[in-house]
């Protein structure tokens, strides 16, 4: 059984800006979303919980530089996408 990805309006805007700024990783980004939908615990995603201001959110890696933050609703098998961008920019949640 697969997971349902929830694309909020805010995430969709951030993702569009991210893809515009980083067209070279569209294939990696797409593969990350596909794998997240099939198995969010796959080792290549490097799923881990965040701490501090982002406590309660999780992160998966697109590659070594970029990641996606997300919420999971385990009972519903839903994943709400929150942000996408550079690893260093997640402290302010500004996106890319």
Residue spans for each PLM region:
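Short, hydrophobic secondary-structure boundary micro-motifs
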Residues: 27-28, 44-48, 93
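Arg/Lys-rich, positively charged N-terminal/basic patches that mediate binding to nucleic acids
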Residues: 1-32
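A short, surface-exposed loop/turn module that caps and links secondary-structure elements
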Residues: 34-60
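Residue-level signal for beta-strand positions within conserved beta-sheet cores that form or flank
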Residues: 1, 43-46, 77-80
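Enriched for short, Lys/Arg-rich terminal
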Residues: 4, 65-67, 71-96
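Nucleotide phosphate-binding site architecture
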Residues: 12, 51, 91
């Amino acid at each position: 059984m697969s997971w349902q990805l929830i694309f909020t309006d805010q995430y969709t805007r951030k993702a569009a800006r991210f893809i515009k700024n980083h067209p070279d990783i569209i294939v990696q980004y797409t593969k990350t979303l596909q794998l997240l939908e099939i198995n969010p615990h796959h080792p290549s995603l490097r799923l881990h919980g965040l701490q501090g201001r982002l406590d309660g959110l999780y992160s998966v890696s697109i590659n070594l530089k970029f990641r996606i933050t997300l919420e999971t609703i385990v009972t519903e098998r839903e994943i709400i996408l929150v942000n996408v961008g550079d690893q260093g920019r997640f402290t302010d949640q500004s996106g890319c």
